[in-house]
Amino acid sequence: MINSVRNTVLSVLNKNNYGYISPSDFNLFAKQAQLEAYEEYFSNYNKVVNAENARTSGSDYADLNKAISETMEYFLVDDFLQPFDYDNPSITRNRFYIPSLTTTGNESYMINRVVCYPTKLTDSTNDGTAAFRLIDNTATFLGLVNPGDIVVNWSASPPQTAIVYYTLNNIELLLSADIFPVTGDDYYIISAQEYVESEKVSAGKIISLNLSNITAPSSMFPAYTQDNTLMQLYPISTTFTLGLLGQVKCAYFRYPKEPKWTYITLAAGEPIFDQSQPDYQDFELPQEDEFKLIMKILQYCGISIRESEVAQFAIAQEQHEQPTFSQQQ
């Protein structure tokens, strides 16, 4: 879609000889346009919910909630959070890094849910290998490990996680990922049968909550606060100790990946689209947003080349030809 968007943008600009937008400028404008369109989904979702509550929304093909939710859920991911200190769980003391490019591979836009798994079932070392298997001839997995439990290869760098699909026998588990390619790796297993959801509170509120035994977070009703990089879970006690990878799972909406129009340069100096480049990245928004992306990019182009007519044209087209839900309200 990104090449189609760029070709349309250049066609509109060239029609009246407004100027040329370089690939680097286009990529910058494309990033901002996608972020704008992405954030509009959340504000539009709020308006749709309000319309449903007021009984003014449609159904079947007019069900805007369904269409918006499907697009939003494409960006909803689940990741185990990285503990503050891998090697010293006691130092971690319920502190985990929030999702980011360096810890989970995705930048978090909004955290939706935090689930804690406080119970560690067992730990040992594998002494056999097979694809998607954990083999430990000293183990007794039957009656202890259940489907859905979390297995962590602690010796891998970085540590890797997998979910138990099935207990094959007393010494062998079928896993969701092939995380034991060699023998001699240390592992542990966390129970997914015992879990509790944590509620977010503000840093100021947690102080007042902890002052009362009635309102203080407990192992049955935990809470968490967060800053720019870390999440702190409460209560901090011997009955609720979290410090291992696999003990805290976060469902969050990630930011879309930065779009990048990649190219090769011909002898005459003209850039030609080449999606085989390793840093190529298409837009992640659905095809129906192509028009919106074009109009938003044209607005940035108008500012860049100091042609107010381009920006005004794009704004008018966005409002008239394909109004967003927010503009209809």
Predicted segments, located by residue:
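Autoprocessing Asn-cyclization modules and mimics
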Residues: 117-183
